[in-house]
Structures are given as structure tokens and as C-alpha cells.
């Protein structure tokens, strides 16, 4: 054997080096995955801890970037020629597929992180040849560097593409920060085969056609629906049902869906010029010398008129690089016949086409083609709900243009959160209901003396530490770092649906809110100037006062940070249906689970912690502290490993780790455990899976041991206060 085949250290035949070999996950596939809590660390980010993207973006000459993008649109490159001499449709598809991974069920996906650059999205079958779009953008990204992220640039390129083809957009907001490693927290499905149909193992469908939550795409590797129809079956009516379900899960209603489909397909064409078997591997599987590009095709020239992408071939309308009513006009004007594309895909061609509606070839001006529609397109004509909407848009071009512009803005900005995060000169002034608007601060804020006085009044109101802490947690912990929704700002906990969620114990919640509203009313009425306190601030302040009181009960003097400035949203600013997805079906921090789930309780806890942007130590200290503060749902004693009441001690960890206790499952509930004295057999404690995992899981136990040591009390209080403040402030983008 050649010396080159041997390890330079051991001299043995080379094997995978650092990070290779059989992994813990291979040995123990059911091991709790805590890695999702430690993604995107400073160790993977080349920009450094002091880098402030928002400040850099503010220095960007956005107008100059847009001019460069407009120029690029028609600067066709030989290595990847532009269809019809215009890259606009390609960039629209790139931006659309960047944003289109968003699903409202858990808020994950979307354009906000630039993750299309990384696996798995850079190699998804539905993203075929979008690697070329990003490579075309590289000179512009290279020119402006750190002042514009890839995430922002991809969306901006889509906007400029639309504008360059004749439609003014609704606006653009910057502020999306790039990630630098693949996102591990996003569940894309369980299938082990790209584009697996619903009859394959580990399908995302059950029942007649019930799509697994929180997924929105119909197949692994697709962004939306299968354009050929459900599982490739060319049935427009059935396709309409898929389209409706998928777009609804992306937070789009029927009118927005029709506008997006019809508006998006006003531009460009599909590519299926030949046998898909001639297309090479995706970027992540491509040879090193391809330099990050994939899908190299040996069909003809492999580009231009020989391009193979989706497998469907053709354009929807006569002028594919101009905003007009051509798509809807052609859709309703003609009957359609089912054919196979050169790549073998199901598609539809218009019958008996007038010459004026024939489409000039994208690369040969001497050729013309009949307009094409996908099965999904035809759902706009045959679905009984979509059809009248589409006809109305056809008859009202201005309404259609406005509907598409607004829906496109929503599509590309949905995961950014509130307007407070928007940057740049093109931010629309209009408040939109899906942005969860909150009134701007219009009064003088409370000062340190007011804060101290209000805390004293709250503690003297008769509300317990448990009530104060639980209410503040219920308000703030709705936040999702995935799409920056939820949180305490706005005090929407007083409105439906949040006030009625089971986890919030509605009757108990109303008592607390009424008491706090009384304190708010008295304080505001007693001010001679314009000073006020919002209920949103008072809810959080009450929680902070409760934590401080519990720390005092433990002999610690803890000052919990508090920054006023939250405002109270109006009920008309609150879309109840939209907020319903924020309801916790399980909240391990409150030892709550609405029902039995196939997923283990500790996995649901980690998922929730990740949405709250918590690390494993933060999750650990919060669970241990909240148990001591009486924050359990229904005043349950599960996990309350202490004989003290409302006292912020490290008893949870001390007693959890006590070898004098032996644990066994409860005879009444397999997810509840009983801890008995090892010697006497006397019952000492009860706990759930969420409680015991901090003693069972080796990584979490290592953290728990830090807080369970004799010198752990002080650090426990400090770390709990810091983690508490983090959760209370997650939505305070105004403080950034």
C-alpha cells in the first residue's frame, strides 16, 4: 500500500479524522439532541463578536446597489445565459424559494438567514440551478461586502427583478443577518428519499391527505406543491387543495395565494429541455472542481435552451419579461391539453393558440412555442374558490398589481418580525396586520423611583410570587426567535386567543390582570404630567418583583433588570387566527403538556427552548428556578423538589441529584415518576420526564451539577436572573 494511504500519526491505513467515525447519534439514535441550542456560535461566524450588521447596513448606498442589480438583469453571461436576455425571472425564483421555506406553524424557514447558501437548501431538488443565480450575484456581494448580507441581497435582487420588468414593488426592508452553518433546528420531514411520494415510508401524510405539522411543502425537497399535481398526478382540482393547504401554512390567504401564483408566473419559464438523467449531482454532492456548483448537465450545451431544472418546459405567456395581464388572459382564454415535457414531466399546453399568444423561444428568436401551464396553475381556473378571485384580478389589473406587490412583500418579510426590525429607506409606512403592530411610545416612561414604587404596590396587592412570575412568563415566552413573533410587548395576553389558552389558566390569569390593571389605572391617574405605565410593562415588572422577592426569601439580594418602553397593542391590531399558532401545546418550563404526543416531553422542551433562543445552561437554570417559584401549570408539585415556598434556591438540583432518592415510573402515568427514600421507601417527590431529564441526560446532568454544588446557590441566582431577563426582553428590538 502506498505511504499516501496511511495515517501520518499511526502509520495505519487512513480513516476519517477529527469528527469522523461512528458517532454518539449512531450508537444512540434516540439521544436527546441539544445541538440545536448551540447553533450559529461565534466559532463559526467569521464576522466577529463586535460586528453590528444593522449599523453596517445603515452605511449602505441602497440606490447604488439597486442600480448595479438593474444592470445585472440584462448582462447575460456566456457561462449561464439569461432566458430572453433577462435574469429577472431567475432572481425572482431565487428570492421566492429563499422566502418560501417559511411555515407559520413554528415560524422556522424563510429568507431571514440566507440559508439557501447552505445545505440542505442549496441542494434541494426544487432549488435546482439557483446556485447559478447566487453566483451571478457574487460580484455585487463582493463589491458591497459586509454592508449587505446574502439574505438581504437575495430578497433585494428579487425586488429589483420585478421592478426592472415593469411593476413597482411595495417596499423593501433590510436587516436579515446571515447564518454561517446549516440550521439544525428546522424539521424538513422524515422521508429518506428526495421527492418521495405520499405512499413511501415515513410519509408526511396520514389519513386521506393530512399533512404533518409544522410542514408546509408537500414533498421532501419541494418549496411548495408538486407542480405536476399531488404525487405527480395531473389533477387540477386535487392540486388546488394542496395549494390551499400549503400556502395557508405559509400564512397566505386565498387572495394572496392567487396573486402570488399568477404574479410570479407572469415572469420567466420552466426548464425541462431533455432527459433529467443527464443532470449531474447537486452542489453538496458535486466534485470538488465544480467549486460549489451542481446539477451539471450533459444534455446539449447544458445551459441556455438546453437547460433542465424542474423538468417542465416552457413559458406561461407571450412576454415573459414584462409585467402584464398575459398569464391570467392566457389561462382563461384557452383550453388545455395534457402532454409530457421533453424531460417526461406532466404539463399542459394551450390548444389552438392565436399567433399573438405564441411565445418566442428564450434563446432562438426564430422559434415559437405554445404557452404552458402546470397542473398547479390550472387549479386557479378550476378550483371553485380560486377561480372567481383569478377572474376578478383579470378584470381589475390595478387590483391585481397591488395584491401581488403586497403579497410579495409579505412573502419576503414575513419572518422578520415587527417593523422595529426593518432597516433602510424603502420601508413602507403602512402598518400591516401580519406585522403584529404595536403603538409607538407616546408618553413619558417611568423612572427608577416609579419602578421601585410600582414593585412595592404589586407585592402589596395580594398577588403571590407564583402568580406574578407565571403571568410574566406566559406573556413573554410566546416569543419565537424563528420569526421574531410573540413576546410581552403589546400585552396581547389580555386578548383572545392568548387569554383563553389552557396553559395560561384563564381564570387565574384574569385575577392577575385585573389586579395589575387596577395598579396601572391608579398610577396613570395620579400623574400630573404625561407619564404613564403600560400594562405590558407592568406584567413584566410584576414578574421581576416576584423573582426579587423569591431571591430575598432565599437570603439573596438580586436586582432583576427592567427596561420600560413596552406598549399595549389594540385588539384590532391583533389577528387572533394568526396568533393561535403561538399557543404552546407543551411548555416544559411550566410542566405543561396539553395532550400525549408521539414526541417525548423533553424533546418538546428543547424545541421550545430553541425558539426562545436559549442555550442548554439557560434552559437548565430556568427550569430549576421556575419550579422553585411555583410556576407549574395547575400548581402541580411535579418537579418542586423543595419544602420551601416561593424561594429561589438551588433545591431542584440538590434534590434531583441526591443518591438517597430512587426513581420509578408512576403506576398511573408512565410520564410521571416517583422519587422515594432509598432506605425507607417513603415517597419524597414526583417529577415528569422534563424534570428527570436534567439528572438522566449526561450533558444536562453536567450542567445541573454546577448548580447542585454547595457553592452553586449564588451562581444559580445570578444565572437565573440573567436568563429571566433575556426571556423578558426577547422582543425589545427597540433596545438593540
Swiss-Prot record:
<dbReference type="GO" id="GO:0005829">
    <property type="term" value="C:cytosol"/>
</dbReference>
<keyword id="KW-0349">Heme</keyword>
<dbReference type="InterPro" id="IPR019793">
    <property type="entry name" value="Peroxidases_heam-ligand_BS"/>
</dbReference>
<protein>
    <recommendedName>
        <fullName>Catalase-peroxidase</fullName>
        <ecNumber>1.11.1.21</ecNumber>
    </recommendedName>
</protein>
<dbReference type="GO" id="GO:0020037">
    <property type="term" value="F:heme binding"/>
</dbReference>
<dbReference type="InterPro" id="IPR002016">
    <property type="entry name" value="Haem_peroxidase"/>
</dbReference>
<dbReference type="GO" id="GO:0042744">
    <property type="term" value="P:hydrogen peroxide catabolic process"/>
</dbReference>
<dbReference type="InterPro" id="IPR000763">
    <property type="entry name" value="Catalase_peroxidase"/>
</dbReference>
<dbReference type="InterPro" id="IPR010255">
    <property type="entry name" value="Haem_peroxidase_sf"/>
</dbReference>
<comment type="function">
    <text>Bifunctional enzyme with both catalase and broad-spectrum peroxidase activity.</text>
</comment>
<feature type="region of interest" description="Disordered">
    <location>
        <begin position="1"/>
        <end position="25"/>
    </location>
</feature>
<feature type="cross-link" description="Tryptophyl-tyrosyl-methioninium (Trp-Tyr) (with M-250)">
    <location>
        <begin position="96"/>
        <end position="224"/>
    </location>
</feature>
<dbReference type="InterPro" id="IPR019794">
    <property type="entry name" value="Peroxidases_AS"/>
</dbReference>
<comment type="subunit">
    <text>Homodimer or homotetramer.</text>
</comment>
<keyword id="KW-0408">Iron</keyword>
<comment type="similarity">
    <text>Belongs to the peroxidase family. Peroxidase/catalase subfamily.</text>
</comment>
<dbReference type="Pfam" id="PF00141">
    <property type="entry name" value="peroxidase"/>
</dbReference>
<feature type="active site" description="Proton acceptor">
    <location>
        <position position="97"/>
    </location>
</feature>
<keyword id="KW-0560">Oxidoreductase</keyword>
<feature type="binding site" description="axial binding residue">
    <location>
        <position position="265"/>
    </location>
    <ligand>
        <name>heme b</name>
    </ligand>
</feature>
<dbReference type="GO" id="GO:0046872">
    <property type="term" value="F:metal ion binding"/>
</dbReference>
<feature type="cross-link" description="Tryptophyl-tyrosyl-methioninium (Tyr-Met) (with W-96)">
    <location>
        <begin position="224"/>
        <end position="250"/>
    </location>
</feature>
<feature type="region of interest" description="Disordered">
    <location>
        <begin position="294"/>
        <end position="313"/>
    </location>
</feature>
<keyword id="KW-0479">Metal-binding</keyword>
<dbReference type="GO" id="GO:0070301">
    <property type="term" value="P:cellular response to hydrogen peroxide"/>
</dbReference>
<dbReference type="GO" id="GO:0004096">
    <property type="term" value="F:catalase activity"/>
</dbReference>
<keyword id="KW-0575">Peroxidase</keyword>
<keyword id="KW-0376">Hydrogen peroxide</keyword>
<feature type="site" description="Transition state stabilizer">
    <location>
        <position position="93"/>
    </location>
</feature>
Amino acid at each position: 500500500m502506498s505511504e499516501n494511504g496511511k495515517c501520518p500519526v499511526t502509520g495505519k491505513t487512513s480513516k476519517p479524522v477529527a469528527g469522523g467515525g461512528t458517532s454518539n447519534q449512531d450508537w444512540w439514535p434516540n439521544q436527546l439532541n441539544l445541538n440545536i441550542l448551540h447553533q450559529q456560535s461565534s466559532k463559526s461566524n467569521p464576522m466577529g463578536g463586535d460586528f453590528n450588521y444593522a449599523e453596517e447596513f445603515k452605511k449602505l448606498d441602497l440606490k447604488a446597489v439597486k442600480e448595479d442589480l438593474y444592470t445585472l438583469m440584462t448582462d447575460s453571461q456566456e457561462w449561464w445565459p439569461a432566458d430572453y436576455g433577462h435574469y429577472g425571472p431567475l432572481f425572482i425564483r431565487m428570492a421566492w424559494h429563499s422566502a418560501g421555506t417559511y411555515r407559520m406553524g413554528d415560524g422556522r424557514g424563510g429568507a431571514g438567514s440566507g440559508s439557501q447558501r447552505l445545505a440542505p437548501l442549496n441542494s434541494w431538488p426544487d432549488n435546482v440551478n439557483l446556485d447559478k443565480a447566487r453566483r451571478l450575484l457574487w460580484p455585487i456581494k463582493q463589491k458591497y461586502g459586509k454592508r449587505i448580507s446574502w439574505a438581504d441581497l437575495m430578497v433585494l435582487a428579487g425586488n429589483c427583478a420585478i421592478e426592472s420588468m415593469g411593476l413597482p414593488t411595495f417596499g423593501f426592508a433590510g436587516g436579515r443577518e446571515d447564518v454561517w452553518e446549516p440550521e439544525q433546528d428546522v424539521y424538513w420531514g422524515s422521508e429518506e428519499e428526495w421527492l418521495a411520494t405520499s405512499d413511501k415510508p415515513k410519509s408526511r401524510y396520514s389519513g386521506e391527505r393530512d399533512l404533518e405539522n409544522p410542514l408546509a411543502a408537500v414533498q421532501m425537497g419541494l418549496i411548495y406543491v408538486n407542480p405536476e399535481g399531488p404525487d405527480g398526478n395531473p389533477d387540477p382540482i386535487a392540486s388546488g387543495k394542496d395549494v390551499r393547504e400549503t400556502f395557508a401554512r405559509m400564512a397566505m390567504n386565498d387572495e394572496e395565494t392567487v396573486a402570488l401564483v399568477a404574479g410570479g408566473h407572469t415572469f420567466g419559464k420552466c426548464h425541462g429541455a431533455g432527459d433529467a438523467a443527464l443532470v449531474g449531482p447537486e452542489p453538496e454532492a458535486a466534485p470538488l472542481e465544480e467549486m460549489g456548483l451542481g446539477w451539471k448537465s450533459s444534455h446539449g450545451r447544458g445551459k441556455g435552451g438546453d437547460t433542465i431544472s424542474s423538468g417542465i418546459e416552457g413559458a406561461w405567456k407571450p412576454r415573459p419579461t414584462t409585467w402584464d395581464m398575459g398569464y391570467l388572459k392566457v389561462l382563461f382564454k384557452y383550453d388545455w391539453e395534457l402532454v409530457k415535457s421533453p424531460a417526461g414531466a406532466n404539463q399542459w399546453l394551450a390548444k389552438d393558440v392565436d399567433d399573438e399568444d405564441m411565445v418566442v423561444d428564450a434563446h432562438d428568436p426564430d422559434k415559437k412555442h405554445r404557452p404552458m401551464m402546470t397542473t398547479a396553475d390550472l387549479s386557479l381556473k378550476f378550483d371553485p374558490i380560486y377561480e372567481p378571485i383569478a377572474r376578478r384580478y383579470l378584470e381589475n389589473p390595478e387590483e391585481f398589481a397591488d395584491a401581488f406587490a403586497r403579497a410579495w412583500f409579505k412573502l419576503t418579510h414575513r419572518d422578520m418580525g415587527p417593523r422595529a426590525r426593518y432597516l433602510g429607506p424603502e420601508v413602507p409606512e403602512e402598518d400591516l396586520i401580519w406585522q403584529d403592530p404595536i403603538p409607538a411610545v407616546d408618553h413619558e416612561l417611568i423612572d427608577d423611583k416609579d419602578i421601585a414604587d410600582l414593585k412595592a404596590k404589586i407585592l402589596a396587592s395580594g398577588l403571590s410570587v407564583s402568580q406574578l412570575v407565571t403571568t410574566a412568563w406566559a406573556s413573554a415566552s410566546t416569543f419565537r426567535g424563528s420569526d421574531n413573533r410573540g413576546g410581552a410587548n403589546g400585552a396581547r395576553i389580555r386578548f383572545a386567543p392568548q387569554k383563553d389558552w389552557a396553559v395560561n389558566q384563564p381564570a387565574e390569569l384574569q385575577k392577575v390582570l385585573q389586579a395589575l390593571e387596577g395598579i396601572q389605572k391608579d398610577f396613570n391617574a395620579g400623574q400630573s404630567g404625561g407619564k404613564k405605565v403600560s400594562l405590558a410593562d407592568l406584567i413584566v415588572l410584576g414578574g421581576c418583583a416576584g423573582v426579587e422577592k423569591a431571591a430575598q426569601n432565599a437570603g439573596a439580594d438580586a436586582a432583576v433588570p427592567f427596561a420600560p418602553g413596552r406598549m399595549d397593542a389594540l385588539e384590532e391590531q391583533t389577528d387572533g387566527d394568526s396568533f393561535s399558532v403561538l399557543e404552546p401545546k407543551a411548555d416544559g418550563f411550566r410542566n405543561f403538556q396539553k395532550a400525549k404526543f408521539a414526541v417525548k416531553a423533553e424533546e418538546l422542551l428543547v424545541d421550545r427552548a430553541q425558539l426562545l433562543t436559549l442555550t442548554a445552561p439557560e434552559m437548565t437554570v430556568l427550569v430549576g428556578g421556575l419550579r422553585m417559584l411555583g410556576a407549574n401549570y395547575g400548581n402541580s408539585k411535579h418537579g418542586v423538589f423543595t419544602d420551601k415556598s416561593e424561594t429561589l434556591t438551588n433545591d431542584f438540583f440538590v434534590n434531583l441529584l441526591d443518591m438517597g432518592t430512587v426513581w420509578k415510573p408512576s403506576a398511573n402515568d408512565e410520564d410521571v415518576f416517583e422519587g422515594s427514600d432509598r432506605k425507607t421507601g417513603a415517597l419524597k417527590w414526583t417529577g415528569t420526564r422534563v424534570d428527570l431529564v436534567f439528572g438522566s441526560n449526561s450533558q444536562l446532568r453536567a450542567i445541573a451539577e454546577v448548580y447542585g454544588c454547595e457553592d452553586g446557590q449564588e451562581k444559580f441566582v445570578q444565572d437565573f436572573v440573567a436568563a429571566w431577563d433575556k426571556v423578558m426582553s426577547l422582543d425589545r428590538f427597540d433596545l438593540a
